[in-house]
């Protein structure tokens, strides 16, 4: 549900510049209905309070959001409630922000303080200890969204083809991310309520994800659309009682065109392709990159476009030698993945004690990673927990979870044992006896002298060639952000062209396509 929350942030990204000129307290209220694939899934009620505090101008923006949605693979329905309050000083200078989020059984509180040259973030999930982050602004072209709108308006640049690029703060990524505003024409749009909305169209590309806006004369959103197929429209009021219109299912799996026989760890290579529109550019990265998981090429045939990938085995070589355990030396680039995060509470006393108990007899780092992977695989029941995405401690307490919880718990336990580890997301090929499918998936990587893939959901340290990499789901790691959302809004269905099992010749499917990989 991170997708939905990220989109709703854009509902308060612009506030009337005129409000900064007020001298007496004034309150404004705005309401929005939220949709996913044309089904009403929630709402947001926003208030803007303008006042003078100790002789200085203040604007406080408060948003109350509710969303309800359902997953396709298990039919689980989640309710998300979120409250955000942000305070601004003169010239839309951000001062502070507090966000409280309830996702099923999980509660998260995030506090942000803006100071000269620094953004400080403190976040705590459930009963976990608060985790602090500091983002340095030195040398950065940092700007808040409200400041960006005010700049465009004051300079007379709210007209077609005008662009403004800057570094924006992403509270979800705990990092500065590139942001570009591209101003379009004055446009009209028919709302789902039947009302005609008219305003200035603006395309916002932030952190690799694109969002389309329709703004009124004061810069307030009339309509919002994201690449995740989530949209919002301003309305006069929220219906009472509010009812969700048949919560839509998030399509989390796609049927595969072939069942590869045998043990999936023995897949040494797999070639696939899929149709996908050209949706990158202007700061949006390609959907796939060539990396240790796969080689990638883009293809075009007539009006059709897409990607082809040659997936590589991630199994450990037979002569792999892991460093002794506990680790005595860690690469500088891997050290940051030893720190606790709100999702992976490696400093939690209960998790730290369990980690120490699991690895107490391990002699090398591979043995330790294998023991932790095996523990997580056996400990967590393979079913959804009480929230869309649980923290490691919450998953441990509930003793259940899907792939996301397996990855988070493994990473937390590995870090507690002194092994750098990180969460990864993408898609994976899974096969049974008679059927196979591709599913959105989360797994881990652990540093054993080099990065090694770990999938605790299936108890594998080192995996076969069946993973498509999207991004690292860690604070500060923004590369690839938004890729899952882009797949959800398009008909993303990988087609297997060929594969090779260990010790066997390549098998190419009938009528398959062949691409030249570098």
Region roles according to the model:
Residues 15-19:
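Sec/Tat signal peptide C-region and signal peptidase I cleavage site
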Residues 20-118, 122, 135, 154-319, ...:
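Acidic, serine/threonine-rich low-complexity disordered tracts
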Residues 365, 369, 403-407, 437-440, ...:
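Active-site-proximal structural scaffolding
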Residues 145-148, 317, 322-401, 476, ...:
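Secondary-structure boundary elements
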Residues 4-14:
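Bacterial N-terminal signal peptides
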Residues 372, 399-427, 444:
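Cysteine-centered nucleophilic/redox motifs
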């Amino acid at each position: 549900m991170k997708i939905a929350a990220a989109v709703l942030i854009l509902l308060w990204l612009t506030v009337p510049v005129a409000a900064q000129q007020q001298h007496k307290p004034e309150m404004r209220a705005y309401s929005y209905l939220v949709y996913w694939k044309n089904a009403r899934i929630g709402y947001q009620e926003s208030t803007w309070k303008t006042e003078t505090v100790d002789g200085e101008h203040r604007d406080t923006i408060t948003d109350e959001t509710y969303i309800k949605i359902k997953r396709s693979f298990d039919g689980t329905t989640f309710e998300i409630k979120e409250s955000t309050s942000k305070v601004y000083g003169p010239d839309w200078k951000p001062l502070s922000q507090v966000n409280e989020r309830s996702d099923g059984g999980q509660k998260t509180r995030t506090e942000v303080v803006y100071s000269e040259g620094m953004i400080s973030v403190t976040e705590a999930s459930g009963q976990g200890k608060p985790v602090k982050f500091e983002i340095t602004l030195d040398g950065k072209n940092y700007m808040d969204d409200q400041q960006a709108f005010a700049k465009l308006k004051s300079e007379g640049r709210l007209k077609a083809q005008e662009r403004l690029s800057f570094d924006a703060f992403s509270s979800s990524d705990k990092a500065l991310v590139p942001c570009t505003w591209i101003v379009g024409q004055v446009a009209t749009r028919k709302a789902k309520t039947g009302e005609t909305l008219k305003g200035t169209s603006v395309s916002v590309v932030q952190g690799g994800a694109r969002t389309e806006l329709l703004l009124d004369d004061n810069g307030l959103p009339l309509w919002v659309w994201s690449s995740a197929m989530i949209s919002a429209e301003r309305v006069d009021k929220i219906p009472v009682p509010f009812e969700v219109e048949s919560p839509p299912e998030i399509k989390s799996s796609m049927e595969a065109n072939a069942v590869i026989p045998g043990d999936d760890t023995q897949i040494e290579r797999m070639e696939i392709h899929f149709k996908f529109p050209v949706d990158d550019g202007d700061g949006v990265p390609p959907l796939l990159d060539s990396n240790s998981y796969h080689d990638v090429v883009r293809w075009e045939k007539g009006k059709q476009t897409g990607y082809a990938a040659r997936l590589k085995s991630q199994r450990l070589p037979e002569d792999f030698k892991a460093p002794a355990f506990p680790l005595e030396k860690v690469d500088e680039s891997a050290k940051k993945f030893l720190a606790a995060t709100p999702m992976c509470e490696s400093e939690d006393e209960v998790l730290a004690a369990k980690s120490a108990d699991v690895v107490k007899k391990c002699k090398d780092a591979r043995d330790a990673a294998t023991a932790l992977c095996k523990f997580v695989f056996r400990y967590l029941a393979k079913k959804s927990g009480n929230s869309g995405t649980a923290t490691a401690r919450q998953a441990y307490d509930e003793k259940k979870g899907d792939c996301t919880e397996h990855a988070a718990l493994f990473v937390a336990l590995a870090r507690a044992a002194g092994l750098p580890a990180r969460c990864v997301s993408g898609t994976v090929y899974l096969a049974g006896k008679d059927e196979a499918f591709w599913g959105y998936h989360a797994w881990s990587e652990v540093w054993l002298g080099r990065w090694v893939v770990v999938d605790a959901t299936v108890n594998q340290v080192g995996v076969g060639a069946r993973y498509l990499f999207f991004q690292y789901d860690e604070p500060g790691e923004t590369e690839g952000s938004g890729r899952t959302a882009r797949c959800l809004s398009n008909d993303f269905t990988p087609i297997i062209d060929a594969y090779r099992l260990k010790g066997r010749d390549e098998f190419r499917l009938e009528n398959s396509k062949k691409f030249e990989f570098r």
